[in-house]
């Protein structure tokens, strides 16, 4: 009896199943280790596969680390990559199988009773399952199969994109037509394809045959056209989610299969034997192959080349079940397919009995409810250290550290004075409070040196930043250079996968140094969390940022955290290290008093007299990756970390004592986890602090593990050495572990154990005495330590902390790699790059590299690789190329000598592509480029497409260097040329060179259209081939010719008048190409032979662009009808139309036919592109076999235009390429060097080049006055000792710092005793502090200091070089104090002092420096004797002048009153200032004698010299200059400009009468007059004024200043609104002659200096504004000040257009822009002062409450500098003490008479008016003011509603314009603000005449926007794009957007009252933000309407809801075609926007 058996059929599905959803269910299974292992293997494999891809392919994949992350991101993606789809489908099928057959009770299927079926992708899974007999066998093969599926999908995606580019969401490539049989479908398709003339690559085809219908596949556009026709029943078609072409024999060949499998290359699996019956999806029969390799080949053929025959599978299965076999029943197990039931039904229909379907393998059923919380297994990767750098005690770099270690030096020394003063802080008795007993430490050489510009820190911020933080930045950069780490260049170097970990255990800088003057940057500068945080911010790392404090083990604990993050998969790269910079004496005092520290010097580690540790400094950084990632990235692996761990000595008797058991436990834990024998560790770097207890305990714990006495001793091959770096460089505390690790790394690198220098006397007696017996050693001299053959050396680094923690790290040698083959390097020429952020650094970097090359003679390919692909590149850059090192060396030396080395490359230059036409081809023209796999694979694929289309192979054109090209058919040449050009362009693009425009000459336009995205690759090849084919078939070759002539079209027509010819090409205005028959061309040549014109007959078989083409045009048009044309992704410069094309409408069959026949007007096309700005400043890359078009480009555009070729005939390809790359690189193009080198990596290595040469400057805030010693003392809490006079009310500071004494005196100028001095002296009715008050303050403090210093006994105070820079105008009384401070710093060695006068806030914050001076202390007696000797002569001159009064007409006498009337135009005086009673004046000699007697003298007050006296005694000098006979006060008046010296020999009395004599001379070169004045009391000299300076001021300027007088200004109310006249005074009328020139360039430079905070001395020509911190906001500020102070109308974009000082200066001096406000010569300091005095009134109540602007480099008080003209900068605020809005003048000037309207623009969601900076000038009569949100940079404070914030806006608007009519507007939500403001102003009775709403939503409760929207905008560059350069947005930007939306969320606008509603203009953008972007924005069904407003294409351009708020009849509606919400504010769209606004505002004007 025959036993009937059941057959089981396992059916693996295809891509139609949702594999991701199934996998997301399976990954929740945590109790199946084999399944988890499979997912981990797949994840690792896919990451590696993607990482090996070219960048152009890699960037299209989502990034992931875990399998769960991969699934989540694929599920969210709207367009998953076919390679991932296919891989995940295969993964899902195999995972379901693994899950089922690892479940209890399930064995691997029986080979006899099981049949496997694979549908498409499922055939791969069936092959893997069928070649195994257990799950254990299956795991590696399953992973390999998934990767084959990935590669197949990658290949399919490539073919898909070549056939039809993806332009949005993916479209289906397959449709199911139920009920249609195969034969009918085949005939239908054949007929349809012929009728449409579709190329073979575009024609739909049958991909699946089933009993119930067929599946058709093809291009989505072709399928849609097919279904739209009447050929097929569209209503029955079902779309299948297949998004690429499969089962297409016309698209894939066997070579493609081989290519896929060649890349799979796992030969160990190929021989696996097939164990199961697997049905063919082609024949339905069992596949007759034996091995896995053959099965996979068959499967790929079935997937790619053969249709899926479901009908045959059903038939075959049915026959098997109906056969005589004992198997009578069948169970179908479907996996990842829904075909189970239909297959069962079909089998039953065939008569098969007992068919069941068991869905148990589907994931949802397989998982059921047996999920557990068991976690999955984590990987145990080894970790690679790939880079390190540091600053160490007495060693500024790694090499210096090794040198001192090698020499065994102890670098402990006395504490440097810049840390603290050992004389005051060290007290061995410790009796003095807060002192320490040790003066020793191990110190960094120059901890304050830092390159602030490199890291974009302002000179103000840099000193406040902790030196540890600064040095961490620099060492991190150096370590990354060491490692060759370029963020975002590889999968493991992605910025969001890099974490930063630093150990730091104190805040010394913040506690001691920067806390002495807490400022804006105190927190980010001093808090240790910012040490790693600053790294993340500057380097843009988005991974974790940890600051670790575990006391002394902090650095290694940070490394432990970093290792865990790497092993867990949280990050892929770790930057880790430690810092310790000692500036706080308290910590040292505390450690010393806690008995930690040695009093005798350094750590005496292992010494018997060890008495504590010595504190040490250091900053170290290392770069770590997982070992497999480091290998994959070709990183320089220095050592491998086998394990790291941290524990705690919880059982110790004291928290500060180490515990032997805990230390032993940590060693054992690390060794066990790493699987390492303790005896294999050859060196232990011990903690070794040098304490008796600590050293002994550590030694015991180390020996107990690594050399226990109870076990066998170590052999000689196992010798163990011990040591500690602390004996050399002290105990670095938080950096001690990293220093020890770096020492260990260098030991491995240098094969040496350095000597231990800690034993000063004898070894610690507490150590075991049998160390030698145990073979344990302490090196006393350098010991060679070579790596054993075939083995590794291992080192344990131990670190413990005073807080009880222990951290240990185990490292070993890096893996030994096989010697790399040098034969693989085909490149004959190589590039070497050097770059820097400044010219000085660049020069230093070049010199360093030259020295390195001389010393090491590196391999040139690796040198090229390291300097390009493994370096971050900066704006100052050079590149050279050559075949060998000597040539590279010589070229670099030439660069050093070239002046261009100072030049900065322009940022992110654009390149345009020009495609060569006919005539440049030659055999073998692309042969060398085939070495690039990207180029080679493109060529192979294009050749396959050409052959598929029926064209011959064009490979002979490229591959052979022999033969004549004329022997090749035109079809081969033309198709080969087009394909080669496309491949070349794609090669350039793979290197990061994306075209900004394309142009093709003749045949070259086909490749240009493909690269522009207009044509797919398949269609391009079809069109080029079809055209050439038609030419070959329908036109006779060589019957016509083409002739190039060196002349214009017009001259050609004149010379060839009456002849027949066609103008084929107009290449340039002087180069023309003719076409015609041979006879016609011969005739033309005869005529031209008598001319000198250049003429060349072209070697072409046809006369293109002539009548010869006409026979093929209709056929060509017909053939092109089946081609699809797309929107250009880049502008196409069309020689046919002579214009730039940016839409697809012009393209089509007609265009191509005309292109073939009509003239190539290359010259006009380029002229149009230039006029349209498409190619402005672009570089050109010529794509072709030989540079022909380059010359045309230069002749048409600019002879200096930079063009680079790709190839050049008869020239080495590598030489051409490297030269071109060098030109692009030096021009500022960012090249993707990793892609350039990718194919040659096996022969390349990362060299250890010299580190970057920093531009170092000292930034240090000195700890002063020893205040740590007095903290808490009563004396410490007291104020400064008292000193009080009338003009110095108190001393606010008195301190001594070394040899310097600082004294600061303060006066309240509004106090009753001082106020009269100020109000009694007025300029244009403004009370100004006179120089006499400054002088009195300085004299008082000088006298105070003189009396303090015994050495100054017998001296007098001499006040010298008084220079009043900015006037000090007083405010109204009753407004609180108005404080002026005098700062005197005296050098006690020279006894010379500097003096500065500052206005300050009541809190003491400096506002403006008003004057400078100096003081000296000459011997009083000697000085008086010297002047008294001259007194007799002076008195004789005075008597002689009196005698000449009646005889010399030039001598005259007048009363003081007359004199004051003469100078009244300068100033007005109270009677107290009018003390000159008479003047005797000699006009010829400019000499005067004056009598000074005071009116109504005040006798109260305490003075050194009464200010009235000082002023009155100096007045006669002005009388001399303004009252002499030559003076013409109608033209010029003279003002006082200070003096060189002023001193008094005795006290003066205001009740006495004095005589003075003065004689002036001049002018000098600066136009100054000078002289000395001597003051007499009777015959005694009592005072001398030396070097009095006076300068003339043009009267017109004085009149202008007088006209600006505003008597109400000084008393303006605190509310602060100005009336119209005030506004005019603040913004003077324009001087039409104002223009940019050399004079006001200095003024501009001063403005830039003040706004950036960078001293003028540092504004070197090469200084880049980016590096100076001139961002968009600062650029606006500078431009606003240029406009208002210099009258120069420059836009803020000049800082982008001219990015360096040098470029801006050159532009500045070229000519004059529009002018606005008047300017005064920047060279004239006195004129500046006079000009400013008229504007100097500033309400100090307002300013004292202003936000500190010093971060911008200037105070809101600042008005004028001594060398430039400056008015108060226009970043003004309301006077409210609360936060207030600010505004900037963006265009025009409201004060100009020609200004008829001021438009106020409110900020958008960014809060910044910089959004409007790109608007070109609207109209000369319109001023534009941009308003900034008060919460712009502090969005966390933006919690108020719209009413509150708009009130702040209104206050600022009314400050500028008190009354209407107003013009308001705004973009985006700025329009909402402007609407609400308009309503509020109308409610206040003001008129709003115009309202402009720019793409603004109706305010009916704004929707909250999802975070993904902001992230998307940032990703595509909308938030940080500057001139096409993607930059990171400011950190506050997105937060402000969100805060703004929160504020407006509840605002529902009410309608405007109709009778006072403004005229309204509404301007709409038309396009969605992602119209031209990839990827598209992730739109979701639940998106709020507000999001749709921003992201959707507009269709309604009406009022769109605004008509409910404003009268529609008063609206003007405009739209911006082609622009989206963001782009409408930029570029050409911004120009159109300005024009629209102008048209609206100028109605009626």
Curated annotation (Swiss-Prot):
Cofactor requirements of the protein: pantetheine 4'-phosphate
Keyword annotations: Acyltransferase, Phosphopantetheine, Phosphoprotein, Transferase
Gene disruption: observed consequences: Impairs the production of asparasone A and causess the formation of greyish-yellow sclerotia rather than the dark brown sclerotia normally produced. Leads to a significant decrease of resistance to insect predation and increased susceptibility to the deleterious effects of ultraviolet light and heat.
Top class in the EC scheme: transferase
Location of the region described as N-terminal hotdog fold in the Swiss-Prot/TrEMBL record: 1289-1422
Top-level taxonomic group: Eukaryota
Pfam families per record: Acyl_transf_1 (PF00698), ketoacyl-synt (PF00109), Ketoacyl-synt_C (PF02801), PP-binding (PF00550), PS-DH (PF14765), SAT (PF16073), Thioesterase (PF00975)
Compositional bias of kind Basic and acidic residues: 1739-1750
Protein name, per record: Non-reducing polyketide synthase pks27
Taxonomic classification: Eukaryota, Fungi, Dikarya, Ascomycota, Pezizomycotina
């Amino acid at each position: 009896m025959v036993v009937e058996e059941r057959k089981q059929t396992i059916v693996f599905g295809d891509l139609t199943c949702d594999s991701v959803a199934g996998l997301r269910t399976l990954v929740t299974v945590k109790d199946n280790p084999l399944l988890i292992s499979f997912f981990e293997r797949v994840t690792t494999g896919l990451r590696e596969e993607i990482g090996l891809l070219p960048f152009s392919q890699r960037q299209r994949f989502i990034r992931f680390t875990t399998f769960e992350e991969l699934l989540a991101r694929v599920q969210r993606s709207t367009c998953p990559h076919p390679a991932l789809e296919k891989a995940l489908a295969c993964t899902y099928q195999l995972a379901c199988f693994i899950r089922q057959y690892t479940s209890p009770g399930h064995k691997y299927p029986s080979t006899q009773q099981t049949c496997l079926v694979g549908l498409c992708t499922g055939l791969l899974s069936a092959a893997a399952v069928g070649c195994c007999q257990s799950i254990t066998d299956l795991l590696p093969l399953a992973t390999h199969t998934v990767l084959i599926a990935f590669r197949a999908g990658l290949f399919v995606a490539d073919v898909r994109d070549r056939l039809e580019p993806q332009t949005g969401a993916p479209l289906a490539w397959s449709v199911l037509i139920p009920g249609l049989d195969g034969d009918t479908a085949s005939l239908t398709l054949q007929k349809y394809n012929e009728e449409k003339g579709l190329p073979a690559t575009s024609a739909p085809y049958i991909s699946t045959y089933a009993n119930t219908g067929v599946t058709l596949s093809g291009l989505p556009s072709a399928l849609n056209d097919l279904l739209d026709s009447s050929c097929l029943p569209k209503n029955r078609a079902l779309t299948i989610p297949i998004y690429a072409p499969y089962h297409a024999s016309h698209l894939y060949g066997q070579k493609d299969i081989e290519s896929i499998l060649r890349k799979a290359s796992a030969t160990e699996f190929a021989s696996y034997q097939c164990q199961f019956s697997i049905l063919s999806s082609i024949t339905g029969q069992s596949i007759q192959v034996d091995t896995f390799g053959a099965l996979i080949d068959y499967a790929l053929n079935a997937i790619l080349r053969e249709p899926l025959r479901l009908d045959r599978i059903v038939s075959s299965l049915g026959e098997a079940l109906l056969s005589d076999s004992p198997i009578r029943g069948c169970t179908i197990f479907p996996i990842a397919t829904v075909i189970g039931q239909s297959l069962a039904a079909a089998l039953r229909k065939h008569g098969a009995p007992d068919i069941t379907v068991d869905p148990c393998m589907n994931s949802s059923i397989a998982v059921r409810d047996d999920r557990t919380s068991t976690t999955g297994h984590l990987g145990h990767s080894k970790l690679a250290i790939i880079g390190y750098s540091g600053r160490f005690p007495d060693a500024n770099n790694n090499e210096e550290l090794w040198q001192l270690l090698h020499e065994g030096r102890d670098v402990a020394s006395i504490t440097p004075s810049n840390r603290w003063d050992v004389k005051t802080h060290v007290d061995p008795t410790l009796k003095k409070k807060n002192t320490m007993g040790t003066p020793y430490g191990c110190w960094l050489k120059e901890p304050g040196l830092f390159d602030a510009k490199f890291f974009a820190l302002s000179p103000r911020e840099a000193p406040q930043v902790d030196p540890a933080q600064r040095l961490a930045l620099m060492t991190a950069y150096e370590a990354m250079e060491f490692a060759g780490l370029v963020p975002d260049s590889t999968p493991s170097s992605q910025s969001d996968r890099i974490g930063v970990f630093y150990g730091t255990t104190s805040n010394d800088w913040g506690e001691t140094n920067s806390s002495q003057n807490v400022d804006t940057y105190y927190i980010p500068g001093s808090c240790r969390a910012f040490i790693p945080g600053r790294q993340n911010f500057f380097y843009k790392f988005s991974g974790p940022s940890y600051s670790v404090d575990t006391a002394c083990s902090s650095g290694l604990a940070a490394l432990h955290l970093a290792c865990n993050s790497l092993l867990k998969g949280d990050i892929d790269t770790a930057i880790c290290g430690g810092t310790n910079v000692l500036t706080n004496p308290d910590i040292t005092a505390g450690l010393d008093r806690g008995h930690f520290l040695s009093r005798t010097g350094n750590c005496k580690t292992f010494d018997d007299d060890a008495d504590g540790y010595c504190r040490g400094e250091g900053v170290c950084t290392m770069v770590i990756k997982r070992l497999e990632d480091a290998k994959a990235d070709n990183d320089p692996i220095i050592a491998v970390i086998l394990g790291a761990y941290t524990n705690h000595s919880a059982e110790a008797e004291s928290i500060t004592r180490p515990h032997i058991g805990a230390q032993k436990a940590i060693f054992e834990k690390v060794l066990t986890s790493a699987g390492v024998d303790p005896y294999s560790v050859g060196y232990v770097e011990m903690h070794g602090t040098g304490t008796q207890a600590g050293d002994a305990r550590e030694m015991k714990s180390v020996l107990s593990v690594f050399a226990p006495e109870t076990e066998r001793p170590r052999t000689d091959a196992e010798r163990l050495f011990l040591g500690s770096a602390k004996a050399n460089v002290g105990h670095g505390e938080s950096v001690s572990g990293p220093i020890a690790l770096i020492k260990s790394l260098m030991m491995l690198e240098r094969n040496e154990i350095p000597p231990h220098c800690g034993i000063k006397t004898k070894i610690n007696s507490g150590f075991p005495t049998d160390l030698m017996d145990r073979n344990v050693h302490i090196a006393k001299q350098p010991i060679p330590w070579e790596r054993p053959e075939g083995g590794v050396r291992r080192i344990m680094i131990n670190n413990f902390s005073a807080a009880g923690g222990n951290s240990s790290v185990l490292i070993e040698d890096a893996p030994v790699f096989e010697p790399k083959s040098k034969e693989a390097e085909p490149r004959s020429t190589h590039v070497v790059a050097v770059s820097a952020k400044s010219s000085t650094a660049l020069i230093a970097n070049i010199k360093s590299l030259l020295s390195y090359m001389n010393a090491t003679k590196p391999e040139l390919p690796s040198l090229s690789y390291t300097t390009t692909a493994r370096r971050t590149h900066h704006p100052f850059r050079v590149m050279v190329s050559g075949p060998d090192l000597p040539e590279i060396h010589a070229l670099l030396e030439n660069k050093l000598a070239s002046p261009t080395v100072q030049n900065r490359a322009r940022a992110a230059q654009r390149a345009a592509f020009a495609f060569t036409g006919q005539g440049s081809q030659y055999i073998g023209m692309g042969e060398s480029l085939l070495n690039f796999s990207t180029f080679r694979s493109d060529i192979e694929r294009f050749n396959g497409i050409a052959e598929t289309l029926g064209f011959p192979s064009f490979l002979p054109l490229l591959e052979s260097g022999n033969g004549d090209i004329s022997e090749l058919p035109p079809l081969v040449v033309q198709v080969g040329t087009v394909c080669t050009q496309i491949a070349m362009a794609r090669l350039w693009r793979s290197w990061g060179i994306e075209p900004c425009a394309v142009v093709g000459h003749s045949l070259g336009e086909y490749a240009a259209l493909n690269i522009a995205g207009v044509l797919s690759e398949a269609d391009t090849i079809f069109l080029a081939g079809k055209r050439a084919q038609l030419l070959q078939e329908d036109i006779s070759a060589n019957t016509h010719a083409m002739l190039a002539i060196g002349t214009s079209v017009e001259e050609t027509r004149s010379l060839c008048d009456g002849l027949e010819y066609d103008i084929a090409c107009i290449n340039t205005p002087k180069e023309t190409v003719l076409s015609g028959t041979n006879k016609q061309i011969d005739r033309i040549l005869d005529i031209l032979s008598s001319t000198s014109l250049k003429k060349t007959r072209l070697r072409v078989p046809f006369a293109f662009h002539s009548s010869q083409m006409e026979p093929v045009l209709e056929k060509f048009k017909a053939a092109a009808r089946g081609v699809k044309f797309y929107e250009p992704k880049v502008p196409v410069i069309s020689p046919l139309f002579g214009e730039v094309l940016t839409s697809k409408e012009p393209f089509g069959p007609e265009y191509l036919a005309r292109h073939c026949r009509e003239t190539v007007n290359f010259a006009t096309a380029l002229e149009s592109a230039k006029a349209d700005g498409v190619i402005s400043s672009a570089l050109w890359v010529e794509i072709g076999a030989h540079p022909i078009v380059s010359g045309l480009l230069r002749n048409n555009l600019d002879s200096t235009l930079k063009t680079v070729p790709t190839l050049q005939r008869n020239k080495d390809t590598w030489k051409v390429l490297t030269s071109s790359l060098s030109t692009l690189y030096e021009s500022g193009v960012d090249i993707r060097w990793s892609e350039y080198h990718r194919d040659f990596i096996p022969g390349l290595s990362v060299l250890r080049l010299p580190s970057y040469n920093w531009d170092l400057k000292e930034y240090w805030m000195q700890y002063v006055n020893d205040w740590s010693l007095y903290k808490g003392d009563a004396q410490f809490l007291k104020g400064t000792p008292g000193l009080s006079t009338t003009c110095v009310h108190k001393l606010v500071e008195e301190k001594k710092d070394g040899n310097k004494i600082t004294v600061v005196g303060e006066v309240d100028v509004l106090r009753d005793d001082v106020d009269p001095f100020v109000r009694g002296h007025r300029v244009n009715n403004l009370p100004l502090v006179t120089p006499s008050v400054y002088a009195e303050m300085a004299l008082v403090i000088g006298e105070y200091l003189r009396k303090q210093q015994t050495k100054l006994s017998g001296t007098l105070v001499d006040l010298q070089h008084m220079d009043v820079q900015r006037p000090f105008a007083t405010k109204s009384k009753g407004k609180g104090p108005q404080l002026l401070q005098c700062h005197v710093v005296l050098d006690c060695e020279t006894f010379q002092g500097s003096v500065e006068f500052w206005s300050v806030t009541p809190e003491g914050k400096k506002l403006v420096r008003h004057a400078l001076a100096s003081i000296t202390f000459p011997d009083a007696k000697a000085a008086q004797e010297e002047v008294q000797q001259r007194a007799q002569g002076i008195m004789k001159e005075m008597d002689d002048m009196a005698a000449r009064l009646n005889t010399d007409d030039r001598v005259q006498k007048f009363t003081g009153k007359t004199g004051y009337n003469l100078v009244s135009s300068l100033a007005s005086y109270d009677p107290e200032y009018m003390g000159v009673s008479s003047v005797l004046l000699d006009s010829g000699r400019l000499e005067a004698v004056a009598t000074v007697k005071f009116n109504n003298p005040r006798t109260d007050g305490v003075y050194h010299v009464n200010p009235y006296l000082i002023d009155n005694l100096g007045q006669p000098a002005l009388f001399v200059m303004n009252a002499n006979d030559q003076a013409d006060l109608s033209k010029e008046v003279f003002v006082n400009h200070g003096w060189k010296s002023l001193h008094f020999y005795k006290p003066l009395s205001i009740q006495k009468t004095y005589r003075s004599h003065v004689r002036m001379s001049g002018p000098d070169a600066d136009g100054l007059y000078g002289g000395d004045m001597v003051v007499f009391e009777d015959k005694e000299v009592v005072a001398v004024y030396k070097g009095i300076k006076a300068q003339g001021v043009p009267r017109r300027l004085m009149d202008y200043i007088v006209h600006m007088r505003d008597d109400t200004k000084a008393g303006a109310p605190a509310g602060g609104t100005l009336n119209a006249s005030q506004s005019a005074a603040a913004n003077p009328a324009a001087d039409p002659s104002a223009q940019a020139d050399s004079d006001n360039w200095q003024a501009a430079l001063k403005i830039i200096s003040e706004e950036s905070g960078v001293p003028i001395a540092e504004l070197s020509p090469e200084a880049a504004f980016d590096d100076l911190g001139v961002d968009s906001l600062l650029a606006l500020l500078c431009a606003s000040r240029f406009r208002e102070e210099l009258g120069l109308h420059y836009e803020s974009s000049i800082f982008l257009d001219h990015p360096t000082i040098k470029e801006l200066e050159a532009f500045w001096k070229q000519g004059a822009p529009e002018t606005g406000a008047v300017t005064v010569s920047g060279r004239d300091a006195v004129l500046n002062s006079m000009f400013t005095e008229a504007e100097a009134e500033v309400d100090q109540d307002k300013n004292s409450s202003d936000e500190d602007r010093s971060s911008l480099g200037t105070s809101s008080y600042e008005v004028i500098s001594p060398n430039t003209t400056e008015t108060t900068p226009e970043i003004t605020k309301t006077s409210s003490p609360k936060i207030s809005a600010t505004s900037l003048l963006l265009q025009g000037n409201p004060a100009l008479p020609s200004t008829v309207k001021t438009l106020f623009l409110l900020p958008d969601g960014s809060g910044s008016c910089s959004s409007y900076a790109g608007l070109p000038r609207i109209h000369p009569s319109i001023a534009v003011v941009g308003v900034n949100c008060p919460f712009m940079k502090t969005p966390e404070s933006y919690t108020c509603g719209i009413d509150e914030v708009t009130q702040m806006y209104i206050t600022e608007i009314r400050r500028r314009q008190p009354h209407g009519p107003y013009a308001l507007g705004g973009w985006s939500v700025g329009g909402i603000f402007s609407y609400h403001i308009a309503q509020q102003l109308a409610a206040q009775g003001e008129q709003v005449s115009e309202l402009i709403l720019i793409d603004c939503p109706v305010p009916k409760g704004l929707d909250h926007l999802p975070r993904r929207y902001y992230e998307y905008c940032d990703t595509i560059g909308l938030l940080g794009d500057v001139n096409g350069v993607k930059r990171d947005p400011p950190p506050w930007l997105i937060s402000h957007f969100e805060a703004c939306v929160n504020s407006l969320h509840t605002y529902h606008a009410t309608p405007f009252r109709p009778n006072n509603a403004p005229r309204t203009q509404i301007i709409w953008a038309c396009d969605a933000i992602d119209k031209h972007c990839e990827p598209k924005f992730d739109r979701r069904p639940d998106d709020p309407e507000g999001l749709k407003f921003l992201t959707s294409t507009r269709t309604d351009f009406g009022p769109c809801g605004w008509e409910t708020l404003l009268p529609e009849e008063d609206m003007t509606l405009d739209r911006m075609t082609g622009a989206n919400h963001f782009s409408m504010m930029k570029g050409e769209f911004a120009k159109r926007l300005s024009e629209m606004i102008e048209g609206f505002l100028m109605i009626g004007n």
